[in-house]
Amino acid sequence: MSDRSLRVEAVVLRHSDWGEADRLLSLYSREAGKLRAVAKGARKLRSRKAGHLEPFTRVALLLARGRDMWIVTQADTQDAYLPLRESLTLTGYAAYVLELLDRFTYEEGQNAGLYQLLIDSLERLVVVTDTFVVVRYYELHLLDLLGFRPSLTACVNCGRPIQPQDQFFNAQMGGVLCPDCGARIPGSRPVSMAALKYLRHFQRSSFAQALRAQIPDATRAEMEALLSYYITFLLERGLNAPAFIRKVSQD
């Protein structure tokens, strides 16, 4: 295939209106990482492409190089993950998975590990009832693949191994602090040993092993809050999907 065209498998991260009838797509592809592409006429009622280009659809695409960005010439749905569209809560979690990847990545080439994590996570949301494990596992392994793995085994300030007691976490320093260091370093927040134990377990385990963990509700809430704090620090802004998830969970 010439350098004027590209065939990829990709997940649609988001789309927006472009011109009078077109749609601008943000894609994450297996072959080329993050891409932007225009789907000509996708907003027209009779467009054959429109149904293949909705967010969290996995789609096979043929792209042609335009003046400034790729143009979609063919689109064929591989998996629409329909159950994720039938529940507002699952829609929210799927949107969070996409938004997190979208905010953290740029158009910088292939990353097969990230693409596989994305596909695995969408499939897990379809079949696994414990969405907490799916999402926390995704967050931790996404951070790992992006080079932001939080250090959870030794104090990031003094280097001493973590002892079986409550500790501190500092987002700016990228990991856990022992009680002595955490108490005197600004920006540190307490974290229980139970939360650290399960976060470390998720980091080093397979998804199947993580799914077997029996995690108390209070510890789940603490893990979610700590990862949200760390991710918000890294992105320097909040995300939209968590507020939607909270709203539909309360309704």
Labelled PLM ranges:
Residues 1-251:
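Non-catalytic alpha-helical scaffolds and adjoining flexible linkers that form interface surfaces
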